[in-house]
Regions:
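Loop-to-transmembrane helix entry/capping segments in MFS-fold secondary transporters
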Residues: 15, 97-109
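Transmembrane alpha-helical cores of Major Facilitator Superfamily
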Residues: 20-23, 27, 76, 107-115
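Helix-to-loop junctions at the C-terminal end of transmembrane segments
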Residues: 31-44, 128
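Intracellular juxtamembrane helix-capping segments at the cytosolic ends
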Residues: 84-97
Length: 161
């Protein structure tokens, strides 16, 4: 709907552009998975520290963009961030808990995307009525705050020398 409203595209043209945007996100996610996540010697904390700002920037780009090309770059950034964030957050969450909590934590991590699919669309629809780009701006702000909180938590959890 965003592409129809913002770019005045027909439903068919909007669907094609959404498909290309999603493909750019998926390609970036796969690329980062097969390169950095699988082969780089980054710690999970390092990947978290890199991926969350990338996601915040991606949402900010979606909020501010004015051309489809910037939208595609933003979606590629989204794929890079998600491709690093999800596995590193899952690994960190299970590492920092007791063995008896690991199955519960893994279940919560697995359920988190489903909660986003349940609560995200109605909340985004409310924001969309105020300003069609507002859901992206709010997501960027929330990710920025989350990034700061995670940096603080990682700094506190870092071993002291």
């Amino acid at each position: 709907f965003y592409l129809i409203d913002f770019y005045q595209l027909s439903p068919v043209d909007a669907a094609q552009q959404v498909g290309f945007a999603m493909m750019s996100s998926a390609a970036a996610s796969l690329a980062i998975q097969y390169t950095v996540v699988q082969k780089a010697r980054m710690t999970k904390e390092g990947m978290i520290a890199l991926s969350l700002p990338i996601l915040a920037i991606a949402y900010c780009m979606l909020f501010l963009h004015e051309t489809l090309y910037v939208l595609y770059v933003a979606m590629a950034c989204m794929g890079l961030g998600m491709g690093m964030a999800y596995p590193s957050l899952a690994a960190a969450a299970t590492t920092y808990c007791t063995p008896s909590q690991q199955s519960t934590i893994t279940g919560l991590i697995t359920a988190t995307p489903a909660m986003g699919y349940i609560f995200g669309p109605p909340l985004a629809a409310l924001l969309y009525q105020q300003n069609i780009a507002l859901p992206f701006g709010i997501a960027s702000a929330l990710l920025s705050v989350t990034t700061c909180l995670v940096f603080i938590a990682l700094k506190r959890a870092a071993p002291k020398h």
